[in-house]
């Protein structure tokens, strides 16, 4: 059986650090493989089944600089025209981890995900704490709409 080859820009372990949707509760807590976790949405064209998986895949897309995926999963009414994510830029954040705090579906087409994303820029550690809102479109795909952001900054010693 041939194994799929990952492109040089794709990690083996998933940047989101979360459990792949098929993972069993109580299973070993090692990072899931990118191809089975967020890669199937970012590279495989599969639609995220819930806003939670979409949130995780969007975090991974920021880590990897997958701007096209971010645009495709952002509600066109709120997506910034100048969205461009380049993780190799000198002032780009270096993403350190994602923690999901809460996930709720208010109905079949509306959901929220509260998360904390840790990153560094210029020697300073940051925590992006956001309550994100998601909407399922007429095509059945979840999209990020907007969020309430609380950003904290701490000097690395």
Where do the protein language model's features map onto the residues?
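Short solvent-exposed beta->alpha transition segments
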Residues: 72-100
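Short, aromatic-enriched amphipathic alpha-helices that serve as compact interaction elements
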Residues: 49-63
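Short beta-strand edge/turn micro-motifs at domain boundaries
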Residues: 129-157
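Short Cys/His-rich zinc-binding micro-motifs
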Residues: 2-3, 8-31
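A short, polar/proline- and glycine-enriched secondary-structure boundary/capping micro-motif
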Residues: 48, 123-125, 153-157
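Surface-exposed, charged secondary-structure patches
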Residues: 90-127
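Cysteine-rich micro-motifs
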Residues: 31-41
